[in-house]
């Protein structure tokens, strides 16, 4: 970080870092969006054609801005440095798919997500224990590292993909991600967890706010897989660092239901020939727009309100 000389108060450096991350994200997106690939419109999405022609893949801008801000202003050790690299790797897999004339296959993307998830699990276990804390109920349990690694891979892979599937309405996945990671930030402080990654949460949140400045309805550009996949892995790492990974089920509840329901529905139909929720369009944000006739703004606000209520209740339970 730039404060290696100790010449400045850490709180001042942190304050400047937050302003820097937001400002540079806004400026970079304004100047560089013309160089991004153009969206082709999602054929099967509700109002997918409205996105056609918009710059896509803006995740590459706000993710690189976040990483630069983290290196300059956060207390980055080797573990956090590796996480930053993995976030960039996941972002790049999404960006190259965004920029490709022919979209990458589902199996290729799923395999790359799996590889990244395995690396996250190995790195986390190298620097941390295999103890799972129960932040709400109290107590903890130590499980064999191999089992912990398997659960971590599932968590990371699932987080990447449900977050990616939730990216279909202007401002939705970005807003939900901010609520999720800020809930994790509050829980970290309640639990007394103060490390370099805790501050990285704030930097990532303000970079997302800089992106949302342009992505609010009607959006001028889209984050693409470059943004959604990076958000997914960031959420997973952030919740792992709380030491209570099961909190993911609550702090990311709306993302899980919105994006995960479609994944489950597709997997059951494709591999087991079981057709569930025949009258429900997935992701759920498309069902809300198509079947319930919600506007984009209503989807974002109502989904956000639901997650905020769950998050507030979760924080309260952790504090008890």
Regions found by a protein language model. Name each.
Residues 297-318:
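Final/C-terminal transmembrane alpha-helix of multipass membrane proteins
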Residues 16-19, 144-145, 269-271, 314-315, ...:
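A short, structure-level motif marking secondary-structure boundaries and short turns
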Residues 30-53, 99-101, 263-294:
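Cytosolic, membrane-interface loops and tails of multi-pass inner-membrane proteins
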Residues 248, 252-256, 276-280, 297-301:
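Short amphipathic alpha-helical interaction segments
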Residues 2-257:
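"…together with the soluble PPM/PP2C metallo-phosphatase catalytic core" -> "…together
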